[in-house]
């Protein structure tokens, strides 16, 4: 594994506002982290924030070749070399943390917790006004709608 003191993870909402301002800020913060000794960056998937962070880190990798980009995936825990190669075309390493691949609907939450546990620094994009996707749950023949933000859960965990 990696030395935790050199590891940073990115966690944020699926959709982001003020993209241009945020891109500049991500780039600036990431470069400061690199200059302070961070060189392993962990990414989740399925969010605009992660995509923006990946783009910034990838651009910075041309100036700082020691950067390692690691995808923390939530599925395919027993992926073979052929499947992993699809991930490794864009990332330097790919990890499915223990238990995450079988966590079902909690996979994102468990993946984020694993990323936080492996990192000494977490860069969050958390908007208190963000409206998470509402999901319908049926329990004991009672239908309820529940809105949970995985980013808020990760933020509270960190």
Regions found by a protein language model. Give the residues of each.
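Acidic/glycine-enriched connector segments
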Residues: 1-157
